[in-house]
Amino acid sequence: MSSTLREASKDTLQAKDKTYHYYSLPLAAKSLGDITRLPKSLKVLLENLLRWQDGNSVTEEDIHALAGWLKNAHADREIAYRPARVLMQDFTGVPAVVDLAAMREAVKRLGGDTAKVNPLSPVDLVIDHSVTVDRFGDDEAFEENVRLEMERNHERYVFLKWGKQAFSRFSVVPPGTGICHQVNLEYLGKAVWSELQDGEWIAYPDTLVGTDSHTTMINGLGVLGWGVGGIEAEAAMLGQPVSMLIPDVVGFKLTGKLREGITATDLVLTVTQMLRKHGVVGKFVEFYGDGLDSLPLADRATIANMSPEYGATCGFFPIDAVTLDYMRLSGRSEDQVELVEKYAKAQGMWRNPGDEPIFTSTLELDMNDVEASLAGPKRPQDRVALPDVPKAFAASNELEVNATHKDRQPVDYVMNGHQYQLPDGAVVIAAITSCTNTSNPSVLMAAGLLAKKAVTLGLKRQPWVKASLAPGSKVVSDYLAKAKLTPYLDELGFNLVGYGCTTCIGNSGPLPDPIETAIKKSDLTVGAVLSGNRNFEGRIHPLVKTNWLASPPLVVAYALAGNMNINLASEPIGHDRKGDPVYLKDIWPSAQEIARAVEQVSTEMFRKEYAEVFEGTAEWKGINVTRSDTYGWQEDSTYIRLSPFFDEMQATPAPVEDIHGARILAMLGDSVTTDHISPAGSIKPDSPAGRYLQGRGVERKDFNSYGSRRGNHEVMMRGTFANIRIRNEMVPGVEGGMTRHLPDSDVVSIYDAAMRYKQEQTPLAVIAGKEYGSGSSRDWAAKGPRLLGIRVVIAESFERIHRSNLIGMGILPLEFPQGVTRKTLGLTGEEKIDIGDLQNLQPGATVPVTLTRADGSQEVVPCRCRIDTATELTYYQNDGILHYVIRNMLK
């Protein structure tokens, strides 16, 4: 009997006197042909298929198809990918654990074994999304924000602690430790994984999926990983492979070096703009070129982090000497570092100088051409050169709904006994935040050095600026303190407020009352400047209409200037004690100064801070839970509720019903984000979710955020399409989650309309433009629509994760034909929609959509089914991916 490719490729290597078995790509190449120039990222996928070859989910044909990608730099084949582990954060992790607990209830009800609902691969959940910047600008901010976080989220944390003991291979990193992607980069990521199987040590690439779109950051370490929706991650941890098409790979060649005064943030904003323009949705991006020789790993991680912003599945940096240097610096063992080097070289995954893999397409950037930049005011791909920021701000201001920019005069306000004037264009939030940049010592040290020079000259933060520092790990605090820069940041109001995502995800906290009142009084257009990765409308703060991504030193600079209308490249940032003008160039640190400061970062800092990473504070340790396999649901809970998704589920799926007489619930434009669909930030008292909470006895001060209440479907379905900046074209001139209920045309909230349609047994549809579902990976942007009764979303194009999430919740994604849009069709939202023959649906097929207009006339539009693979079709036919997983467990 002939051996399989898997068996024939098994080999051994030695690292630190230890023998490891592995599945050798060079040995497999004897059957597959020359794969030397296969992109390194695809070599990781190839090893995955080789190792998991079973003749069923992974066949020899699958392996040959991936190796054969080289012929056309493209392959039309579905493959089953099994990541080594799963990463979660608490906003997506809580609903995932709710789903797992609900799945146990469903399996129990249907007569199955609840023990089968258990992760088969390691899962790390890092609590980082819950801390809010309530207090800022003083030495007590950190302790107060931590206290409030524990107070508000106690029930959620009890639930996560229950999950930790109820599920195997499930670890929780407690609050106040850091941001999941930075913890992953600095500690959890291994680059090469090893485990004992049948008495042999097996080595294989570290790979993962995560329930956060910025999971891609780990690609900077040479670890292949990307974000998926919570439902897909749950399926993966329960042993279900990730179904995917073999991706195209775009090569991005980096040459040269960054000039003096240019940061990694400027570089990533440039890369993001270039790749968004090139078009990389659903594709891998792999970086190569001699520019990588001098590109620090922290800079690579910054670029990899923003893969969702440029639209790629991942932005991959192959393993090389820079990778090993970072692993040593961050405290990985020498045994692990040697294994990574020997494995990567043995497998052809090591980056050598001059490597030129074959790519589907390529771009090139000479880093010497990168200029100081921000991105804004509403999209991360909209890069603006520093001198052009005032012009970009003015242009966005003119476009605001109901804008009366020319009439907006500065507003007088009193704070702390002093009178000030708040101008239009004021910077009201300046936040050093987000793993994108706080994982990078060079830009953090640059911010501290700029603060030192500013304080020395007597510059002060403008009084209306809410400043904050929220690093992604405690190591940052250690090295800023070692470099003696913390006092200067504190002096300018950049006191430590927490170790978590904070402002970047919308947890910026309230502005001081006088500031909020002044903004509302004259409808001022104000700005937030943050070192984050997202700046979508309504995300950072409900009253802040323009949000700008910038490097940490520029964040400090804008806190000093206090106004988006100032040209920091040519106008004074302030005045020194003598009254002389001070320019940005006067306080910008030199490359040498930054390099000297970065030398303070040491291996001991990483080892000290990660020695007890799973332990937590005394408050966390004090949370006691009762051991049990199933959760004790509390009927009066407003945080954790048994989700209804499996309530009516049977052991055998019913045939998919055709869609008859569907009404359009919302008609939306381009770049509608998952923030628009399912906001993460504050809950308005007069919103459907706010009214629900008040009806359950929750006071306004205890609302917390939508993100923190994702374990309660009642809140989340009411929060669907509730973003205050969403614009439904069915109600022109109105911002917020409103629509028209038809045929009576009553203008009501989207939630209220959906509930009326549900009573009338009317299925629902959403119509949209390009890039529907861009942004965060949040599965509630698919779960919420499902609970509202939405059966189909018809858009010009979809972002990758959201398309997958819709299918995972049993919602049909359809794409208009090329050149056809809601506008060319003249849609008003009053049309009815019919879609038939859904039982015979096929991946990628043309689906006739019948539109019946208000006057009774009809038009058939041939849309493209965006169920892309046979596996996805199976999920859809089962009413969702988790239903499919449960039914498999019952067999």
From Swiss-Prot:
Keywords: 4Fe-4S, Iron, Iron-sulfur, Lyase, Metal-binding, RNA-binding, Tricarboxylic acid cycle. One of its GO terms (cellular component) is cytosol. InterPro entries: AcnA_IRP_Swivel, Acnase/IPM_dHydase_lsu_aba_1/3, Acoase/IPM_deHydtase_lsu_aba, Aconitase/3IPM_dehydase_swvl, Aconitase/IRP2, Aconitase_4Fe-4S_BS, Aconitase_4Fe-4S_dom, AconitaseA/IPMdHydase_ssu_swvl. Pfam families: Aconitase, Aconitase_C. Its cofactor is [4Fe-4S] cluster. It catalyses: citrate = D-threo-isocitrate. Gene3D superfamilies: 6.10.190.10, Aconitase, domain 3, Aconitase, domain 4. It is an enzyme of class 4 (lyase). Its EC number is 4.2.1.3. It comes from the Bacteria. CDD domains: AcnA_IRP, AcnA_IRP_Swivel. Induction: Induced upon entry into stationary phase by iron, oxidative and salt stress under aerobic conditions. AcnA is subject to CRP-mediated catabolite repression and ArcA-mediated anaerobic repression. AcnA is negatively regulated by ryhB RNA. Catalyzes the reversible isomerization of citrate to isocitrate via cis-aconitate. The apo form of AcnA functions as a RNA-binding regulatory protein which plays a role as a maintenance or survival enzyme during nutritional or oxidative stress. During oxidative stress inactive AcnA apo-enzyme without iron sulfur clusters binds the acnA mRNA 3' UTRs (untranslated regions), stabilizes acnA mRNA and increases AcnA synthesis, thus mediating a post-transcriptional positive autoregulatory switch. AcnA also enhances the stability of the sodA transcript. Monomer. This is Aconitate hydratase A. It comes from Escherichia coli (strain K12). The gene is acnA.
